[in-house]
């Protein structure tokens, strides 16, 4: 937000210079982005009056003028501005004046005519970029007065970054309140005298959406002169806040917006049919906006309508049909409180970001509307004339925000600040902030002011007290803590060790938001209810994630859209699963998840371009599981997951308990998410793996190992892992290694069957195994496979 320093000082004028004021505002939590003078450096420019204005005898586009600057005689000045005319009060740079850029004014002849000065435009004085003509001053501007003094150009524009919680500071009044509190000065508000109704004209107002619009004020003003010029003082204040003057009606509503932080809108009353209806838009309803674009509205968009059509997007943008134009004589002033949730996201949906939506999304003071209406009415009538009707107020008290009542405990205050502030000082700070304070024993009851939506809990009051007290006034205290060496179990597996392993395998760690798009999440976890946020950043970030896959897959799409087709990423973080048995109804599990897609290897002339498959990811996952020392207890079972390919996925079990999933993303989900090519994912519950098996020292056999290979034919649906597990189980004392080295389907193997080639490594720690013992153990394995899986040795 930009504002004029002098405008701020009209409300509160501390005895500090501009730099100190800017620093004070920053330390109060409103970061100052810049302080710039409102005009260039110049001197010798005064108010003058064009007494005579005649055509230059030797130039069609020049005029010869005589100008009164309050001296002994009139000055001859040649001017080329198209708006130069007799009787106009202007800014005159006299001989000896120095303009911005060190431009010195000297006596000269222009096309043969003497010129003893220059009539200046705004751009020539470094005030603005407007060079369309010379400055037109009011007819009562005192001749001979220094223009810097008359226009109050010894001023600065201060630009601040207002955080979303401080919507009250999106108006001069909010910044002034903070400066007044910090300097213990009274706030000098402009006198707003209510405008009595002089006519009975009204329009019927109906609010059909009280949750979205708890308060709506409307007032008819008839007989205005919309072509009346906006006073220079108002134009200058608007300009110094970065707003261009449009016309008197729009300028008045913008002025109230900047001064009080209350958005307003003016309708052409004669274009309203029947009356005002505040309602939600009809699905597919259209509205031509003030900028000429057509907006197609959704059913969740608030509109201001008449009895036949939508007139404006509530709290966002006005409509072209009902807008004020050069023919307007009667207006309806609107001043409303719209719920932030009813405005949030709607403007962005249509590519809009207006001053009104910016304020309504963050919250406007619900007690401000009557004051703003009276202020706007008075300014409008003073500038444009006209007569005002009564104010029509439609308020639904049940849906208006309630002021929070907060208890601040002395113990909490001292604990969080780390410094004792006297009771009377705490009370004074809270009252100066606008709170209604009741003192108790070692505590305060404070009712937050209506303009502070961010005061809700005890910590908010602690922050306010510390902020106003001054962070610089809180003494530095050394941290006092005992140095006690923590214990570390050898069985604890550090997540950092796992991350290092994945990094070594070419994965990159990412961190994604815990807030995800509920629509995308439903594609990945259909039918699973997620925790929805009451005040989301946006609609696309309104649900808490049920797994890390939602964010990871979005990251893959983001990279693929930027020509990064080989992606290997992982993430560790919490998922949030609704669970009635968990505290607060939400179970938070620490998860480890990863995604791979694209080529198996980086591009290289000596490496084939092979796409990653299920076994690439399964191999990486087994490396992770091997760090736990429990790989031999892990099973990969065929189990359906709606997000994964039914034939290329598996559930991961540890000691009979499911700990995760691995597999290829389901083709249908791949299509919906716009994934480019085969994408594989895994996810593990980390807490079920963090306790590793500590390796035990064991004797290494000094005797030779023996390898025997067998090929068994089993049904297609028999998992190879079960075959290997059975062999280990049968040969527990002598079989030290079992490996699957070939799978065959085809000639010699019946359809629906497969041949598994297995190597058995046999060894004893105390002696060399005899051939008869080896053969007996192999035979036991074969027999066990026949009995359990109906396996047969392949010929």
UniProtKB/Swiss-Prot annotation:
Keywords for this protein: Aminoacyl-tRNA synthetase, ATP-binding, Cytoplasm, Ligase, Magnesium, Metal-binding, Nucleotide-binding, Protein biosynthesis, RNA-binding, tRNA-binding
Membrane-spanning residues: none
Major localization listed first in the record, in broad terms: cytoplasm
Superkingdom of origin: Bacteria
Cofactor: Mg(2+)
GO biological process terms, semicolon-separated: phenylalanyl-tRNA aminoacylation
Family per record: Belongs to the phenylalanyl-tRNA synthetase beta subunit family. Type 1 subfamily.
GO molecular function terms noted in the UniProt entry: ATP binding; magnesium ion binding; phenylalanine-tRNA ligase activity; tRNA binding
Quaternary structure (record): Tetramer of two alpha and two beta subunits.
Organism: Shigella boydii serotype 4 (strain Sb227)
PANTHER family per UniProt: PHENYLALANINE--TRNA LIGASE BETA SUBUNIT, PHENYLALANYL-TRNA SYNTHETASE BETA CHAIN AND LEUCINE-RICH REPEAT-CONTAINING PROTEIN 47
Domain tRNA-binding residues, every copy: 39-148
Broad enzyme group: ligase
Binding residue positions for Mg(2+): 454, 460, 463-464
Location in the cell: Cytoplasm
Domain B5 residue range list: 401-476
Catalytic activity: tRNA(Phe) + L-phenylalanine + ATP = L-phenylalanyl-tRNA(Phe) + AMP + diphosphate + H(+)
UniProt cofactor note: Binds 2 magnesium ions per tetramer.
EC number: 6.1.1.20
A single cellular component GO annotation: phenylalanine-tRNA ligase complex
Domain FDX-ACB: 701-794
Keyword Cell wall biogenesis/degradation: no
Keyword Oxidoreductase included in the entry's annotation: no
Protein name (Swiss-Prot/TrEMBL): Phenylalanine--tRNA ligase beta subunit
């Amino acid at each position: 937000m930009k504002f004029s320093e002098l405008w701020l000082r009209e409300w509160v004028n501390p005895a500090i210079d501009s730099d100190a004021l800017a620093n004070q505002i920053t330390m109060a939590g409103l970061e100052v982005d810049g302080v710039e003078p409102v005009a260039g450096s110049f001197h010798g420019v005064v108010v003058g009056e064009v007494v005579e204005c005649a055509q230059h005898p030797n130039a069609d586009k020049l005029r010869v003028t005589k100008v009164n600057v309050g001296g002994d005689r009139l000055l001859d000045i040649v001017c080329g501005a198209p708006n130069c005319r007799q009787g106009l009060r202007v800014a005159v740079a006299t001989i000896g004046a120095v303009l911005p850029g060190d431009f010195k004014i000297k006596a000269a002849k222009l096309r043969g005519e003497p010129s003893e000065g220059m009539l200046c435009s705004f751009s020539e004085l470094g005030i603005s970029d407007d060079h369309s003509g010379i400055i037109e001053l009011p007819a009562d501007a005192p001749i001979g007065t220094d223009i810097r003094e008359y226009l109050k150009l010894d001023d600065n524009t201060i630009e601040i970054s207002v955080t979303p919680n401080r919507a009250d500071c999106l108006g001069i009044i909010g910044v002034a309140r903070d400066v007044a509190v910090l300097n213990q000065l009274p706030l000098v508000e402009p006198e707003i005298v209510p405008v009595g109704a002089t006519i009975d004209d009204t329009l019927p107002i109906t609010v059909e959406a009280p949750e979205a619009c708890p308060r709506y004020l409307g007032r008819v003003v008839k007989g205005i002169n919309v072509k009346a010029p906006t006073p220079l003082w108002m134009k200058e204040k608007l300009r110094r806040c970065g707003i261009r003057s449009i016309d008197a009606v729009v300028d008045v509503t913008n002025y109230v917006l900047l001064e009080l932080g209350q958005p307003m809108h003016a309708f052409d009353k004669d274009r309203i049919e029947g009356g005002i209806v505040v309602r939600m838009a009809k699905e597919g309803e259209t509205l031509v906006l003030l900028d000429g674009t057509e907006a197609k509205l959704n059913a969740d968009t608030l509109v201001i309508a008449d009895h036949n059509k939508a007139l404006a997007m509530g709290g966002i943008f006005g409509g072209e049909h009902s807008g004020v134009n050069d023919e307007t004589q009667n207006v309806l002033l609107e001043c409303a409180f719209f719920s932030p949730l009813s405005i949030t996201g709607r403007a962005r949906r249509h590519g809009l970001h207006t001053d009104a939506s910016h304020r309504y999304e963050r919250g406007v003071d619900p007690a401000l509307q009557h004051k703003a209406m009276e202020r706007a009415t008075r300014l409008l009538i003073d500038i444009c004339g006209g007569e005002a009707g009564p104010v029509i107020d439609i308020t639904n008290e049940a849906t208006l925000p309630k002021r929070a009542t907060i208890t601040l405990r002395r113990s909490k205050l001292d604990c969080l600040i780390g410094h004792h502030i006297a009771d009377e000082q705490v009370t004074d700070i809270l009252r100066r902030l606008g709170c209604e304070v009741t003192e108790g024993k070692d505590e305060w009851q404070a009712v937050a002011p209506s303009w502070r939506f961010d005061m809700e809990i005890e910590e908010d009051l602690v922050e306010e007290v510390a902020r106003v007290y001054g962070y610089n006034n809180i003494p530095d205290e050394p941290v006092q803590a005992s140095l006690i060496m923590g214990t570390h179990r050898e069985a604890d597996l550090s997540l950092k060790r796992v991350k290092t392993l994945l990094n070594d395998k070419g994965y990159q760690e990412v961190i994604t938001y815990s807030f995800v798009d509920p629509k995308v999440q439903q594609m990945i976890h259909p039918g699973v209810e997620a925790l929805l946020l009451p005040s989301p950043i946006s609609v696309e970030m309104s649900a808490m994630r049920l797994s890390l896959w939602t964010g990871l897959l979005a990251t893959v799409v983001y990279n693929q859209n930027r020509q990064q087709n080989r992606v290997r990423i992982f993430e560790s973080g919490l998922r949030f699963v609704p669970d009635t048995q968990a505290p607060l109804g939400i179970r938070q599990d620490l998860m480890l998840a990863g995604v791979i897609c694209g080529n198996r290897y980086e591009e290289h002339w000596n490496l084939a371009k092979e796409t990653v498959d299920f076994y690439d990811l399964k191999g990486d996952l087994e490396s992770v599981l091997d760090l736990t020392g429990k790989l031999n207890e892990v099973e990969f079972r065929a189990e359906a997951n709606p997000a994964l390919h039914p034939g290329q996925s598996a559930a991961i079990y540890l000691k009979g308990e499911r700990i995760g999933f691995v597999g290829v993303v389901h083709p249908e989900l791949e299509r919906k998410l716009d994934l480019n090519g085969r994408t594989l994912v895994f996810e593990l519950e980390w807490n079920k793996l963090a306790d590793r098996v500590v390796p035990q020292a064991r004797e290494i056999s000094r005797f030779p190992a023996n390898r025997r290979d067998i090929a068994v034919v089993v049904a297609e649906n028999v998992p190879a892992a079960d075959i290997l597990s059975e062999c280990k189980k049968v040969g527990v004392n002598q079989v030290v290694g079992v490996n699957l080295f070939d799978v065959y389907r085809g000639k010699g193997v019946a359809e629906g069957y497969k041949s598994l080639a297995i190597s058995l490594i046999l060894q004893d720690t105390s002696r060399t195994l005899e051939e008869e013992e080896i053969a007996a153990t192999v035979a036991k394995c074969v027999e066990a496979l026949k009995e359990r899986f109906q396996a047969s040795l392949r010929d």
